[in-house]
């Protein structure tokens, strides 16, 4: 699958692509788990950078052993915060242009992880989604209300509070 991503990287005229663990809602349990799709890494925190000739996986200390087992054949593993992505990228002989899905990053996370080590190019269509056709895998489920035992308050009471707040604005 990495080879398919590298073809897309070439087609987009970029040097690499950044894949975080999170989804666009920054959920703890991300779906789709794009990082696992591309790296096989199943930990709850991590980020991959796929370059034309190298693959990097950044994980925190809880996951270094797991990352080596699950992804070590195809990725160079780095432990954050001991080594930040910008430190690795600065060692490359040129300043790469990296694509990223702008829905998956905050401005602060881009600055803290990449500083001035690369040129960042937002790409609106997520490249991992293109490879795995992930946009068609979202399954709708019926919504449901949690019981008052769980929420501490009836739904109608919460809706009334929300309604009065919105009326004031």
Show which residues each predicted segment covers.
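N-terminal accessory/capping or targeting/presequence segment of soluble
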Residues: 1-93, 101-169
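Ligand-binding face of N-terminal immunoglobulin V-set domains in extracellular IgSF glycoproteins
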Residues: 98
